[in-house]
C-alpha cells in the first residue's frame, strides 16, 4: 500500500510539492520526533507537532464540532502566529495542523503559510473557501496539504453540517480545485450513525483514489459541542469495526 501511494505521489503531484513534503514533513518531521524523545529523557515536555485553532468562525454548524461558532469571533493574528511558530521551530518543530472553525475564513491565513516556507501545514477545512485562486497560491507555497471534510452524500451533508444547502457540492468543488493544482490533498470524515454505512466502504475509498485524493482520515463522532447528540454516536462494536476496516485498507 505504501509503495503504491508513494508511486502516486511521485507521478501525480507537482515534483516541487513532493520535495517540500519530503523535506519539511518527512525528514524534518522525523527530526522533531527525535528531539521530542530526547526532551522527554530530560523530563521536558514540548510536543513534536502542534495543532492550532486559528479562528472560531465557520459558515457551517457541524454536529460534533467542539467550536461554538455562534460566539463572538476570535482569531490569532499573524504576528502572534509568527511568534508561536517561531518558538516551536526553535525546539525543532516543522509541522503544524491548522484548525478552526473554518481556517480559510481567517483573512490572513495565506500570509501565515507564506511567512514560513520551512514548515509544513495540514489544514482541516470544509473546502468551501478554496477557490481556484486560493488553490493556485497553495501550490505556489508548496507547504500545505488541505484535508477536506466530507461527511456523506448531499442529503446527509446538509443535515449534519447545518449549511444553507449545497454543502456537499461546495466541498467537492474545493476538492477539485486542490486536485487540479496537484496539491497533496486528503479527505476526512467524522463517522456517525447517519453516514457509517455509506462512508466506511472500500468503494468510497476507490472513488477518492479515482478523483486523485492521496489520503483519507476517519475519526469518530464525539458527543460534544453546543448541541451534542448522543444518538449519533457509534456503538463500541461499530468503533471496533471501523478500526478493523482502516487497518485492512492500509494493508
Language model features: what each stretch is:
Residues 68-72, 153-156, 223-226:
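A short, flexible beta-alpha/helix-coil linker loop
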Residues 2-136, 141:
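Conserved alpha-helical substructure of the radical SAM core
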Residues 79, 169, 237-240:
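A generic "alpha-helical surface" signal
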Residues 81-98, 106-220:
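Radical SAM/AdoMet-radical enzyme domain recognition
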